[in-house]
Amino acid sequence: MPVTFDEAKCEITLSKDYQFFDYGMDLYAPQSTTDAQGRRIEAAWLRMPESPDGEWIGMFCIPRVTEVIGGHFYFRVHPDVDKLYARKIMSPAEASSDGYKISADLPEEGWINIGGYRIFRKDRTICTDRSRVYRNHTECRCSFSTPDLKDGFHIDVYVDANMIVVYVNQGEYVITNGVYDLKQTVEAGPGVDMVMYT
């Protein structure tokens, strides 16, 4: 829920009903601005326990458009980013070096495994598990979940060599995770129809 601000008293009141910017818990230092169309956009740094190449550590997440609908924050992939993923592919091996996108609806107990990174539906939530693609960093969380969903079980997943972003129901919730050593494979459970783009 948004905060309330009393300008005359210069006081902010926080709601008891809060939601996280991202449910992957890897993002920090969010930064906000407006784009050329006046949309509120945000980006943040991705926390990583080690450098993937031994040199640089951390990266910016995909810019997202922030909207409040019915008191709920939606964080949607910026349309200028989304339109870059226009060519259909059949496997990650066909993807450009900029990564790829997977769109799918997850039925009950449906799952997708992206090179060792698992996304699955559990009851009314979408969950992720990066334990197989996180180089045994046991000091960090590896399992994540959205709160109960209201808008369905659609996911748009943006895959990069060291970052996976799961947009659930066009931004109802988002899970961003740092990853290492992803395999170039994608598998889906029974009843999961998915489409890939690069």
Tell me what each language-model feature is.
Residues M1-P2:
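Loop/turn-rich, solvent-exposed surfaces of beta-rich toroidal or solenoidal domains
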